[in-house]
Amino acid sequence: MSMADEDEEHTKALKAKEMMLPLFQKYNFTLKHNKLPIRHSKDDILARIRENPVIVLEGPTGCGKTTQVPQFILEEAYHRKEYCNIIVTQPRKIAAMSIAKRVSEERKCELGTLVGFKVGLKECLSPDTRLLYCTTGVLLQSLINSKTMANYTHVILDEIHEREVDMDFLLIVVRRFLATNSSKTKVILMSATIDSKAFAEYFKTPKKVGYLTAPIISVDRPRLYEVKEFYYDDLDKLRLDFAIDYENPGISSHMYTVAAKLVLVCDRLIENMHGEERMEYKPTVLIFLPGINEIDRMDHVLRETLTRIVNPKEKPNLDIHRLHSILPADEQVKVFRKPAPGQRKVILSTNIAESSITVPDVKFIIDFCLQRVLFTDTTTNFSTLRTEWASQANCIQRQGRAGRVMDGRVYRLVDRRFYENQMRFSTSPEILRCPLENVILKAKLLEMGPPHSILALAMNPPDLSDIRNTVLQLKELGALVQTVKGNYEQLDGDLTYMGRIMAKLPLDLRISKLIILGYIFSVLEESIIIAAGMNEKNIFLNQNSVRGYSQKMYWADGSGSDGIAILNAYIAWKSRKEQAGNESDMASWTRRMSLDLKCLMDMAELIREIKDRLNHVGMKEVSGPGRVVWSSREKTVILKVIMAGAFYPNYFIPMSVGGKELMERQSFTELGGRDPCNTVFFTGFDHEKYIGPLYTVQIKKLLSEGDFSKHQNMKVMYDRTTNRIFVTFLGSNDEHDQRGAFMPGKVHADVYRAIKLRKLGSRNRIMEIRTMRQRDAIEFATEMNLGHWEDANGWVPRRKVIRNAHLSVIPAIHQASMVCQVTNVIHCNKFYLRPEDTKNKDIFMDIHSKLNSRGYRLERFDPDWQFAVGQMVAAPLEEGSDRYARAVLKNYKNIRSTGDVMWTVFFLDYGHSSVLGQSAFRKLDGPLAYMKEIPQRVFEATLSEIQPSAIISPQGIWTAQSINRFKEMTLGKIFVVDVYSVVNDVASVVLKKGDEVPINSELIRLKFAQYAEESYISKLDHDMRERKQREMSLDEDVRYEVYHSSKNNQLKYEEDELEDVSPPEEKLRCKVMLSGPHSPLETTASSTVRSGVMKPVTIENDSVNSILLDSNPQDTHEKMLVGAFVHEQGNRLVVRQASMMPNIPGFGPLMALIFCPTCQMKKDEEETRVVSILTGLGCDKNTGESLFPEHDLALTLDVVLSDDDITEINALRYTMDTILHTDQDQTVPKFGDVSIENLKAKVKQYIIKILEHERKFMDIRHAPNDYDWKLVEENNAAEASSSSKKRKQDFNIYDNAIYPLLPPLGLLPVSAKQLDFLKRHCRELHKLALTDVNLPRHGITCQMCNTILETLPQLRIHLYSKLHRDRESQIKFR
């Protein structure tokens, strides 16, 4: 023995005496052990461990290797009086904790003393712990941090056959440390099913001559029960003449039938053979399927098979359960319960039951031998789940689920020859098919060379192209910079502070980036919650139902964001949890609110872990007096900003076929002029055969899913010309339902729900109503006084006379302006005006004085009077008031506790609503009866061309602050009212008072509102009014005709509002299949990155954005949707965790410019403006070829981008980089809290300035070769903006910037010749609009807006658009 060896032995003896002797005295090391099979191999195992640096131990499940081998080593250390420190890895947290608990019980010591565990943030250990169970990730992180494993005497890696990415990388690290600084540590590799030779070969060690492969020890376990194997070719009695298509893995309809028959065979025949009728309950059938869709299909086929068995004695009593990873915890628990006597449990499971979950009473296994495997295309970063044949190792593992407590059978639904000769022995390692981002970051933290050289040491090294693409993605994310010590490297890059944090967090890197940006933008707490929720499988329940969708809308609170839905749900749960009386209250609340309690608890645990890890890297919320504070509404916008930054370049543009203008025109024609924001339609109803109003109740039932309270808020209309049924949802989107569920924008929540109802079925879901035979229908409808039948016209609905139509106060076509008083304000887009002309004032005062005069006695209604919707009464202006006014009954509600009926009434002369008991109503009879025939004295109005500011109200509804300000400015006051248009009896107006700024403009100036385009139908009406008013000013005859037209039509008719009637059930003998409901506002999304631009896009079904509608149809600028994750299904992209971005013009391009690695501005031919932007990693400086073409993102601009914008964006990018900057020898930024506080305040200042800046609209022009980079002369980063030179001197961070400064625009002024041409062109368009000539066959093009105009009305409407007016303003045309 050499002197060095003697020193080492002496050190070990001292260490053992100091650190182990107290433990030998404290704990019992001579325990009596159980008789597990592995006990017979104990001496051999210990001898091999002593003699070899690495051993491979293979043994079947249940042989005892996981619990006993570490204890063998522990006890041997006691007998040999040696130091030991053992660590054992498990692939799953629950396994590590439960095994540690079991071993501590066997050793009769408290958990956390001699035996402990560590999983994520949960740890149970102490200085005494010598046997530690942990997850693979915990050991890997520990070894990366310490860069040695000499701290451990024994490293035991269990379940290595699973070959997950972390395990493969851990094997690299362990082998590397064995060969360098940890040669004395013993390594034991263990698994139930393992390709032992490959592992033994991988861990071979050099000797004097050649190499020594790691020895393999096999432990056999004599099975107590037999499991017989059967294959598809053994099932002759069940088979039809059908051959499996092995080239295309999947399940045909025939094979579902085979499996269903097999279940029946198991239930009938086998139980007779085994006498199961004598058992307390019948053993379970476990069916392995590849995914949730297949589980659903198998469930359907099984139940259908049962329904076809007529004889009840032959019908099996099956209790069918589903089992998969996203199943709520309370549903998973049912799988483990014993079935009722005489019942047989059938479990339809994914591979979760293969190893993660054990069902004890399984006798029969039906295995389709399929699995769903995740593959990631590293060039696009799109992941896809492929169905493929399982490996033999998987099938053996599945077989092991049976034969635990009784004999069993496994039926493999493949031919024996295929199983034995063509199925792989083991599944391909994850490292070859899954994302490598986390692995490469861990490789960078190891500091042992470039990532590709480290990963080349893997058992199955990934392709170099996959490593290259992953490095490019990490550079795009900001985890790596483009260079290594200043030199560009394609396969490597220096690690940034952002990259270090990403490597420390147990999350997808994009989610980690969301947290980092949350820190920069002062929303760290919220970003952590959203990130943790996105990392969970799904905290929401009932996603495949309209109720679940409504609940998700409720949690999203009008934000249109899945991330914000997670945030709101978690905060509500946490608050409720603090107040809840007991666990059952909490469980029932979460179920009621469609939340998964277990997922929320796991999420809370993960939030604690994330915060703990962030504290270790110096990232925590600043708490000083100067810290940034956001209002709740600002916070919604900022959260969307950081999502746009974190999930760049997953940007999608919602598109309507043919463009916005065409969509608006089509909406108008498809709905017959009805409002697309609250109307849906069905097709397939033949009005010549059927009388629509008889089936109104059925139509409402289809859309209300049994909630009859919703029927009052639906109006059903029938169109004879198109054979369509229209359903309008009453009340606006901002008057949301009691659940508070709504979406951003103007579209009613019930329109979203209606389309969701259709999409939950097939894409063209057919809805059925039952109808009467025509003769019966005519007879019944006539009897009910619903109308009458005409041979020439068919059914004619009942109509009512509108008397005194000439007294209507709704602005007539000749009224350009009027003087009115504001009588009631609901919000800026809904208020009521009463004209102040003498005639109207006299009528109003007459009504008011008589209703409140002692000379007129108001009579009560009889107690048994039947009130009806639409009836006019006299009612007190408010509860308990003695002032009465005319009111119309709108809807009612029965109060069960008191028996009262409460009515919502609308006051016709004031414009407000109230809820009153019917005892408060008085008759309008006798001398007051004439009042029933006078139209209301107020009309509904909306401020024209404005909408809520997207910054203070991202939900698109008016805030309480803006409504209160509007009330202060207007309520009870008199204004000059300029009438823009009247649509559906609602006037779009401008409110003016003397020389003051119009109210519309003032609200924009105060930042409460932003500009809004008027709707297509509003512009149509505006054009018609302007032309008619122009004709009146030029022609006295026209003026006379228009003024007196109303007097010639004193009797007007409208379809009467009919009470809902239901024909007798026995007369509904026919069926009509309807298609719908449909909305003309339905849109699709398109990707903006090169690799996705030609692929159709779907939003995942459980997203709040799974129904995409054009929520602001009048707005012409592009909206943007951001997805956290994107995966491929066939040729289709599926977006998960989607968020609709704020309705701010230019928001998408602004976000791309703020968060992209670099960009290039594309200009028009004259270089007078930027028409599109190209962002990405840039191009090769020599060839001009894109460095990462698949991720290049192109966006066209529809707003004007200025040098001021670039200056502000550069200031923001520089500040973000400053916050994240570390010098090369630093791992954490060295700023004090005050410096960070100031920098974050600057971030707030810059982002608010960028978002609030009002930009002019411009026409969309696509630059040629949108995705091609153009070689340009290198710009010095310091020249990117005038202010950046000073910054560069102050603090040099641009050697490794994540967000380098963008180049200046360098635009040229518009030439005088071009200006002159555009002005002449404008004059020509305005002249043409005044004529009645026909336009050329293919229309004309507005040269300023690049818009084709096919008809004169289109031309006139275009001239009113903000785009055209902004363009006129830019060229100074008057």
Swiss-Prot record:
Q: Does the keyword Iron apply?
A: no
Keywords, A to Z? ATP-binding, Cytoplasm, Developmental protein, Differentiation, Helicase, Hydrolase, Meiosis, Nucleotide-binding, RNA-mediated gene silencing, Spermatogenesis
Provide the Tudor domain boundaries. 866-931
Broadest EC class? hydrolase
Q: Does the keyword Cytoplasm apply?
A: yes
Localization per Swiss-Prot or TrEMBL: Cytoplasm
Give any Gene Ontology cellular component: cytoplasm
Tell me where the sequence motif DEAH box sits in this chain.
158-161
Protein role: Probable ATP-binding RNA helicase which plays a central role during gametogenesis by repressing transposable elements and preventing their mobilization, which is essential for the germline integrity. Acts via the piRNA metabolic process, which mediates the repression of transposable elements during meiosis by forming complexes composed of piRNAs and Piwi proteins and govern the methylation and subsequent repression of transposons.
Family listed? Belongs to the DEAD box helicase family. DEAH subfamily.
Q: Name one GO biological process term.
A: cell differentiation
Primary subcellular site in the record, as a coarse category: cytoplasm
Reaction equations catalysed = ATP + H2O = ADP + phosphate + H(+)
Q: Name one GO molecular function term.
A: ATP binding
Where do the Helicase ATP-binding domain residues begin and end?
46-212
Q: What is this protein called?
A: Probable ATP-dependent RNA helicase spindle-E
Q: Which organism is it from?
A: Aedes aegypti (Yellowfever mosquito)
EC numbers: 3.6.4.13
The UniProt entry, under PROSITE patterns, shows: HELICASE_ATP_BIND_1, HELICASE_CTER
Occurrences of domain Helicase C-terminal (ranges): 265-447
Q: What taxonomic lineage is listed for the species of origin?
A: Eukaryota, Metazoa, Ecdysozoa, Arthropoda, Hexapoda
Q: Where does ATP bind?
A: G59, P60, T61, G62, C63, G64, K65, T66
